Curated annotation (Swiss-Prot):
This is Cytochrome B5 isoform C. Belongs to the cytochrome b5 family. The lineage of its organism: Eukaryota, Viridiplantae, Streptophyta, Embryophyta, Tracheophyta. GO terms for molecular function: heme binding; metal ion binding. Residues 2-78 form the Cytochrome b5 heme-binding domain. Interacts with CER1, BI-1, FAH1 and FAH2.
Length: 132
């Protein structure tokens, strides 16, 4: 059985000489890798104390990088200790959501102008037919 590590314990290790990160439920002790990371140690330090899965996927790491990660894995995070965060939404879904919102807003704007015009039209029609 894999070593279960609480999120609180992972969050404690957040300095260059003692750095753990959480990616896809796995805990990695990357203290010895800090100087080797192509993006620099600041990039890694920026994702300590949180689930770094989204940040990791955004970079689109190579297969070699993902293979190298196995060397630094020290266990699995206890999922019951991980704070709830926002769910990852791929960029293409974000655009779709924004487009739907824009369509809804434009429909509402159209109604704002059409309803008064419709009321005005009915009022003129009633007045015209009542005068005859």
């Amino acid at each position: 059985m894999a070593n279960l590590i609480s999120f609180h314990d992972v969050a404690k290790h957040k300095c260059k000489n003692d750095c753990w990160i959480l990616i896809h439920g796995k805990v990695y002790d990357i203290s010895t890798f800090m100087d080797e990371h192509p993006g620099g140690d600041n990039v890694l330090l920026a994702v300590t104390g949180k689930d770094a899965s989204i940040d990791f996927e955004d970079v689109n790491h190579s297969k070699d990088a993902k293979e190298l990660m196995k060397k630094y894995c020290i266990g699995d995070v206890d999922q019951s200790t991980v704070p709830v965060t926002q769910q990852y939404i791929p960029p293409w879904e974000k655009e779709s959501t924004a487009a739907e919102t824009t369509k809804e807003e434009s429909g509402k704007k159209l109604l704002i102008y059409l309803i008064p015009l419709l009321i005005l039209g009915v009022a003129f029609a009633l007045r015209f037919y009542n005068n005859k």
